[in-house]
Design a protein with these regions (language model features):
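Extracytoplasmic thiol/disulfide redox context detector
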Residues: 8-139, 207-210, 254-256
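Conserved beta-strand positions that form and line the central face of beta-propeller blades
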Residues: 84, 166, 230
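A structure-centric signal for secondary-structure junctions around beta-strands
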Residues: 98, 147, 220-221
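Solvent-exposed loop/turn segments at secondary-structure junctions
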Residues: 107-110, 137-142, 170-173, 199-202, ...
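Structural microenvironment flanking redox-active thiols in thiol-disulfide oxidoreductases
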Residues: 123-183
Length: 256
């Protein structure tokens, strides 16, 4: 074997070893990632906060809307405080070991679109280990409010997820023509959709989400409550999974 060939083999072997070492180091580091730094919240009691990433900010829960609108006045804060876990996660009982996640988003917040898709993938992968409750928090104007009402109205016809998937995947702003075409495409009644959009029930759902945002101090979207952990801003899949596992281990249900 010549000196040149020997040096080439050694060099290639070194590169392979470095690559394998780097891969191992990444996996090793993943198992020993420092836990998030939690900050206890005094109100509501029992919850804790952890820092998130980017968010789209609003001056108030319904920025840009007429201040006399039903969503911007008379939020049911007292009602929500009295049953905060039901308001966050819904009335349906959770299976043992399931960690609930409440997601607050605006259809036209770019960070929300990424976060919503990540959460949906995570829910599909983790099965009954988590359950996501989707909250509409339209901060970014009239199109956001219209889209939120439409999604909640579609939920009354069992089509929330399909509506959500389409709305977060299109550059188009919600308007009556687009919502009519979307209703026909996914096979739901547009006349019922429009009736439900203006119903008190849909308005109340939006008010409850706004009241929760007020209680937890959310000033933008996306925002999350995972078990008893409150997060303002977008977070990645690894952080989401870590917090979910910590909530399962720490007993999130102590606050509910």
């Amino acid at each position: 074997m010549t000196g040149i060939t020997r040096r080439r083999i050694i060099a290639v072997g070194g590169v392979v070893a470095i690559g394998a070492g780097y891969s191992f180091a990444r996996k090793f580091a993943g198992h020993f990632t420092p836990p998030p730094e939690f900050e206890p919240i005094s109100d509501p009691a029992g919850f804790r906060r952890v820092s998130g990433g980017s968010s789209s900010l609003g001056a108030n829960p319904f920025a840009g809307l007429d201040g006399t609108s039903e969503e911007s006045s008379g939020l049911p804060v007292t009602e929500v405080r009295d049953s905060i876990c039901t308001a966050l996660y819904g009335e349906e009982p959770l299976a043992p070991g399931t960690v609930p996640v409440a997601s607050f988003s605006d259809f036209y917040c770019p960070y929300c679109r990424v976060q919503t898709k990540e959460l949906a993938r995570l829910e599909d992968r983790m099965g009954d280990k988590i359950r996501v409750a989707w909250h509409e928090l339209p901060l970014l104007g009239e199109a956001s409010l219209l889209a939120s009402r439409a999604a909640l109205a579609a939920k009354r016809q069992g089509a929330y997820v399909r509506f959500q998937e389409r709305l977060i995947s299109t550059p188009f702003r919600a308007n009556p023509g687009y919502l009519k075409a979307l209703s026909e495409e996914i096979g739901i009644s547009y006349s019922r959709l429009t009736a439900d959009m203006s119903s008190d029930d849909v308005g109340h759902d939006i008010q409850v989400s706004a009241a929760l945002a007020d209680i937890f101090g959310f000033v933008g979207t996306p925002a999350l409550v995972i078990g008893r952990t409150v997060i303002q801003g977008q977070v990645g899949a690894a952080t989401l999974k870590r917090i979910i596992e910590l909530e399962r281990a720490d007993g999130w249900s102590q606050v509910c």
